[in-house]
């Protein structure tokens, strides 16, 4: 027998298989969810798609978020739509991700707020790349506030690329997955893709562009205003961040938290809030986030 450690550990059951036949033992509600996970994985494989640990964890997480009393639920393994990029097809992994993409599509300025692992920035990059390859925009601009350097890059050793790259690496990673390393570098050289610290956005008006501000909780209110007012004709801006992970000095107001108070409800601007249940990374990531949230609430009480 082969023990499926990922599913077995999560559901506290034994899973055995012989070829394509599986047997499950444990509590009834866990067996029901485990059966549906296995069925969805078979369905996923039937679509000629490779099953990686990422897919397994996704389906397990999806099942765990279903009510225990639900006996005949259906996991939503396939979204109604996907985002095509040159290297891969980006499919929303839960309803929140699909709603966030719809929010970006229907608003010129969109905020995605929530914990790490919910796919906020990755989805924003996917939408940007999708629009770029359709030639609906001419430029993708990705930026982050450089809190550790205080945005004073002159105090860091090396040229601009050497100084900035470590801070922007997560954005590079997403672009490389969707476009490929050589293509990303080609478009950077041509000026079609730009990755820069937030301070370098000052004084510009950006037309026919898709702007993404990542880690926005670490920009100041003035920086947030500066970024949002860079928006030109036929442009979109997406702001992502987590208001529980602010690294600014205690006396400085987070530009993201301030924007929620000032702009939420403003026509043409959307605010989408992710929850810990929307995390699509390793199951432990969701558990860790929830544990810290619980501890934070206890400290407040």
List each language-model region with its residue ranges.
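Interdomain "pre-motor" coupling segment immediately N-terminal to P-loop NTPase/helicase cores
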Residues: 16-77
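Conserved helicase motor core of SF1/SF2 NTP-dependent helicases
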Residues: 85-213, 217-301
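A short linear hydrophobic-aromatic micro-motif
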Residues: 12-15, 271-272
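Intrinsically disordered, low-complexity linker/loop segments enriched in Gly/Pro
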Residues: 71-82, 92, 105
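Single conserved hydrophobic/aromatic residue that forms the stacking wall/gate
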Residues: 1-7, 11
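Long, highly charged amphipathic alpha-helices
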Residues: 5, 33-36, 40, 170, ...
């Amino acid at each position: 027998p082969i023990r499926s450690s990922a599913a077995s550990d999560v559901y506290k059951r034994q899973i055995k298989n012989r070829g394509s036949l599986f047997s499950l033992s444990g509590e009834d509600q866990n067996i029901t969810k485990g059966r549906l996970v296995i069925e969805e994985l078979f369905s996923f494989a039937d679509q000629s798609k490779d099953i990686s640990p990422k897919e397994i964890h996704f389906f397990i997480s999806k099942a765990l978020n279903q009510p225990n009393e639900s006996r005949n639920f259906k996991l939503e393994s396939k979204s109604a739509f996907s985002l095509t990029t040159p290297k891969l097809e980006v499919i929303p992994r839960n309803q929140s991700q699909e709603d966030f993409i719809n929010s970006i599509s229907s608003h010129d300025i969109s905020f995605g707020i929530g914990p790490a692992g919910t796919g906020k920035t990755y989805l924003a990059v996917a939408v940007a790349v999708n629009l770029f390859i359709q030639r609906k925009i001419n430029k993708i601009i990705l930026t982050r506030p450089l809190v550790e350097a205080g945005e004073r890059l002159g105090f860091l050793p090396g040229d601009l690329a050497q100084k900035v790259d470590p801070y922007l690496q997560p954005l590079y990673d997403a672009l490389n997955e969707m476009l490929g390393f050589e293509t990303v570098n080609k478009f950077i050289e041509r000026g079609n893709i730009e990755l820069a610290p937030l301070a370098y956005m000052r004084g510009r008006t950006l037309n026919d562009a898709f702007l993404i501000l990542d880690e926005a909780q670490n920009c100041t209110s003035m920086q947030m205003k500066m970024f949002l007012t860079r928006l030109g004709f036929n442009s979109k801006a997406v702001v992502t961040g987590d208001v529980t992970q602010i690294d600014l000095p205690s006396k400085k107001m987070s530009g993201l938290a301030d924007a929620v108070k000032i702009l939420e409800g403003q026509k043409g601007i959307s605010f989408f809030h992710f929850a810990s249940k929307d995390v699509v990374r390793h199951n432990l990531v969701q558990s860790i986030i929830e544990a810290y949230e619980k501890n934070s609430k206890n400290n407040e009480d």
